[in-house]
């Protein structure tokens, strides 16, 4: 059973455990399950609420997303030019993501090992942990009958031109292609952590609390003694306080909030909140003569890594994901206002969309001294030029596949020749829609505190018992959707921590 803070009547809750895990997403849930399985006393706390399968079925996209995403889908960079999607519920971002499962490229993990960033484990060790978490997820390729028409067109267009595509494995079981992954799965067909790792942790004795917002780790010298925070109401207002006394604390609040929590708890490390990678995305849309009905089917089932180069340390390229994430979300990416926009929305059935995801050179940072994380991220010229290249290629592919028009940011292109006018100006702040959901490397692991925040076991330098187990410990961008890699690294941290 999950204990919901919104239903707790006491104004102050005091708890005690051996291990306190903060966060229930791809990192925290995996750690809690492993520790509980090994017979340890575990309390897992999550700031977001608990939503049972199907409980959001009657909500509109806007209402459901406001409940499930941090800041009601309004979290962004400090200049508000890049929207930052992050799940805030039991299950974390696994509750609202598209369930894509990738192993990180061998070139990258080998680069980390050869450079000395990782010394205590090998790529074979990591593969063991991928296998461990895949036992729960059972990732598989989406059956053809559940792929939407945009996916099929994307595949044919790329294959006809000898461009590579990948049918992506997804952690689903019983998926029927309803297309609502981004707002949870109404039929519980997505193997998010709330349906996999967390129930197993509870079965093995772990206690799980929703609506518990961790705000400070209490230290005595270098030893953490407790986590303190606020109990949130259903409307995300403060309704009480809590304290969890613990022998070990595992921070898994995500790469935006883990460094913030450590910073406001007194951790002083020059790398804290630095080295932020986000995999920035620009959506490109295409208007066709025929009805596409792209909203019928799995939102993301195919991708292309044709233009990636994982051996290049500066320009690793970009990935195309065929994507159609709901009518509301897709409509917000269209150019125009007023009647012009209304007319375009009226043609939504004829639309296709591709995400252009950059394996960026840019690095951002988080200010951990404010009341909430302040994220600074400004695309450098190299990355803007990569977006230009990627947009021209995809735009031409759309026209070759029969598109009448292509939309990019506030621009409408009606012929291939017009694509030549795409320049870096279109990727300045607010000139095009940009968003991200893959936040990484802000508490990165490494050999020493000179360039890292945690060691290779996930322990925070200069502490005795504080660990991090989420995307923030990844030394750099993993170059693919990071969920499975986050889980593998969390499994590794949990294995070592369980021996304490």
Locate predicted features.
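Extreme N-terminal leader/targeting segments of oxidoreductases
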Residues: 1-19, 37-38, 499
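A glycine-rich dinucleotide-binding beta-alpha-beta segment and adjacent secondary-structure elements
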Residues: 16, 167-168, 174-181, 216-220, ...
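N-terminal Rossmann-like FAD-binding beta1-loop-alpha1 element of flavoenzymes
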Residues: 18-44
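Glycine-rich loop(s) and the adjacent beta-strand/alpha-helix scaffold that form part
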Residues: 34-37, 41, 48-53, 58, ...
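N-terminal FAD cofactor-binding segment of flavoenzymes
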Residues: 40, 47-96, 104-106, 151-155
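Rossmann-like flavin
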Residues: 90, 94-175
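FAD cofactor-binding and catalytic pocket of flavoenzymes
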Residues: 97, 269-396, 436-441, 461, ...
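Helical element adjacent to the flavin cofactor pocket in flavoenzyme catalytic cores
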Residues: 180-247
């Amino acid at each position: 059973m999950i204990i919901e803070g919104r239903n707790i009547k006491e104004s102050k809750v005091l708890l005690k455990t051996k291990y306190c895990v903060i966060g229930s997403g791809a990192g925290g849930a995996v750690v809690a399950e492993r520790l509980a399985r090994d017979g340890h006393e575990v309390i897992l706390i999550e700031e977001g609420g608990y939503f049972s399968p199907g409980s959001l079925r009657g909500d509109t996209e806007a209402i459901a997303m406001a409940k499930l995403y941090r800041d009601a889908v309004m979290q962004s960079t400090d200049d508000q030019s890049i929207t930052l999607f992050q799940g805030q519920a039991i299950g974390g971002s696994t509750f609202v993501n598209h369930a894509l499962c990738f192993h990180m490229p061998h070139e990258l993990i080998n680069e980390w090992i050869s450079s000395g960033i990782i010394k205590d484990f090998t790529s074979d060790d990591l593969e063991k942990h991928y296998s461990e978490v895949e036992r729960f997820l059972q990732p598989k390729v989406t059956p053809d009958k559940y792929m939407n028409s945009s996916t099929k067109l994307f595949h044919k267009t790329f294959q006809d031109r000898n461009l590579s595509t990948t049918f992506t494995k997804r952690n689903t079981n019983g998926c029927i292609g309803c297309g609502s992954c981004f707002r949870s799965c109404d039929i519980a067909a997505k193997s998010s952590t709330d349906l996999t790792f967390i129930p197993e942790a509870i079965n093995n004795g772990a206690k799980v609390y929703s609506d518990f917002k961790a705000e400070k780790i209490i230290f005595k010298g270098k030893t953490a003694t407790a986590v303190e925070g606020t109990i949130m109401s259903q409307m995300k207002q403060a309704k009480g306080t809590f304290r969890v006394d613990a022998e070990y604390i595992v921070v898994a609040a995500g790469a935006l909030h883990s460094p913030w929590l450590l910073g406001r708890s007194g951790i002083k490390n020059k790398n804290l909140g630095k080295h932020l990678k986000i995999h920035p995305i620009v959506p490109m849309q295409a208007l066709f003569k025929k009805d596409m009905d792209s909203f019928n089917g799995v939102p993301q089932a195919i991708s292309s890594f044709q233009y990636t180069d994982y051996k290049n340390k500066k320009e690793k390229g970009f990935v195309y994901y065929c994507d159609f994430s709901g009518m509301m979300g897709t409509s917000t990416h269209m150019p125009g206002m007023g009647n012009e926009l209304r007319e375009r929305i009226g043609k939504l059935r004829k639309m296709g969309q591709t995400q252009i995801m950059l394996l960026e050179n840019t690095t951002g940072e988080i200010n951990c001294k404010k009341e909430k994380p302040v994220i600074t991220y400004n695309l450098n010229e190299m990355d803007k030029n990569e977006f230009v290249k990627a947009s021209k290629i995809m735009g031409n592919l759309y026209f070759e596949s029969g598109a009448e028009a292509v939309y990019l940011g506030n621009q409408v292109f009606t012929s291939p020749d017009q694509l030549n006018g795409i320049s870096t100006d279109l990727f300045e702040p607010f000139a095009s829609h940009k968003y991200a959901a893959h936040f990484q490397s802000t508490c990165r692991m490494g050999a020493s505190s000179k360039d890292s925040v945690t060691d290779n076991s996930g322990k925070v330098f200069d502490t005795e018992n504080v660990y991090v187990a989420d995307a923030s410990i990844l030394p750099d961008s993993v170059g693919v959707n990071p969920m499975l890699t986050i889980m593998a690294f969390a499994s590794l941290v949990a294995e070592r921590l369980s021996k304490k």
